[in-house]
């Protein structure tokens, strides 16, 4: 998993919402720093049953208290440049060998998402 935001990024959290109602936080970075471009791994494998949803929540700070805020009086919009903002979470999955990658993932309407597969996707 990775967290990618720009200079106004404040925090990001990944949560699994299981079909039985259980919620499990799998990554929580409460003090994001633009200078950190890290990938995070899990200590233990998590079995994710069909119907589980991944929710990623992030916040941004354009206040005078953020030393990276160039002009707190201006609105910030999404974009590719560092002075613009983005929320680009990434997660890699290892699929059970009996799961068809084409049906393992669905995205919410209106959301932009990418599903990556590779020859290493077979589970042990």
Label each PLM-derived region with a short phrase.
Residues 1-102, 110-124:
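His-enriched metal-coordination microenvironments in redox/metal-binding proteins
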């Amino acid at each position: 998993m990775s967290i990618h935001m720009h200079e106004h990024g404040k925090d990001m959290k990944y949560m699994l919402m299981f079909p039985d109602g259980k919620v499990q936080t799998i990554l929580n970075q409460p003090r994001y720093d633009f200078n950190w471009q890290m990938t995070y791994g899990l200590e233990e494998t998590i079995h994710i049953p069909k119907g589980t949803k991944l929710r990623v929540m992030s916040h941004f700070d354009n206040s005078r208290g953020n030393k990276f805020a160039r002009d707190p009086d201006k609105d910030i919009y999404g974009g590719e440049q560092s002075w613009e903002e983005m929320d680009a979470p990434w997660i890699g999955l290892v699929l059970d060998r009996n799961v068809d990658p084409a049906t393992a993932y669905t995205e919410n309407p209106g959301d932009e998402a990418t599903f990556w597969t590779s020859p290493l996707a077979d589970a042990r």
